[in-house]
């Protein structure tokens, strides 16, 4: 898996490692390893520093518990959606900064629904 990061994000990755610095990327990698049956060996995560083109590399062992948690979460979301349930939102108002820039804002908040 390869990502491109700015210098600030890059320094944090170097200092703390993938699991702590970029938990979303670590989760994505765990799911890939699980569903592509690549769990027996560590995955190679690489990142390029967009500002100076330096390369970061880290061997990431398979985190089965993380992959299972995420898979269970996805199943819950899919099941709820198919049942027509509205899941709790991460924020209480549609004007929250993350909601304003979300591709799913209209669906989540019922705008135009």
Explain the meaning of each model-derived region.
Residues 1-16, 32:
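Conserved catalytic cores of phosphodiester-cleaving nucleases, focusing on short active-site segments
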């Amino acid at each position: 898996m390869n990502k491109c990061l700015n210098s600030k994000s890059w320094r944090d990755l170097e200092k703390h490692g993938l699991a702590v610095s970029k938990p979303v990327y670590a989760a994505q990698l765990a799911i890939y390893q699980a569903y592509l049956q690549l769990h027996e060996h560590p995955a190679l995560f690489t990142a390029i520093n967009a500002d100076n083109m330096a390369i970061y590399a880290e061997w990431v062992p398979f985190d089965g518990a993380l992959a299972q948690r995420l898979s269970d979460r996805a199943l819950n979301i899919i099941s709820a959606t198919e049942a027509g349930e509205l899941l709790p939102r991460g924020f209480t108002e549609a004007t929250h900064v993350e909601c304003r820039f979300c591709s799913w804002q209209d669906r989540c908040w019922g705008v135009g629904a």
